[in-house]
């Protein structure tokens, strides 16, 4: 295997070597290429693609999933959600219009559909283990130290261990979202917070709470658990069809 990798790098151009290095080290910041890599791993390791994608999501790394894939499907299945280890975010799919989206979610028209308000903020994932809190971005960058308000909210919630998914944004005095640039500036490296608006977290999903994984639970159970943990002012507004 080492010889094959060495041969691959030897035949690659400098630009291709840089890309390959990013794949190997887990620093590839391109979701589409990450998906292609997962497909290649599944094919070469002869394991289900769905198992590779789930393991990569839970491990927060395609590289970690690839290592497990070559050990077999059981090794992939052994990778689970861990509080304190960032999870690759699940991204929404697009639809041309509301009717098409509703038809896809509820073909018979009888299934309840939860519709969240779209917030133009920064995607955040919040992990809490006792007093320890971790806040990461959509790209899994650690921004805990830059968002003390989010840490404070997390510590105020009535649970010791949880993983929340949500959005963080700056609000005006009357509670309206400010421009995305105002929110984004708060996560910039070495950016001073002096004179800037406070950031408010709004959560729309709960992945784990006090030893209970909710990833595979029905949507209504996850939302009920979210509502029980997070007060209304820190939840994304939601409409559920009848």
Give the label of every model feature segment.
Residues 1-200, 206-241:
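N-terminal nucleic-acid-engaging modules of covalent nucleotidyltransferase systems
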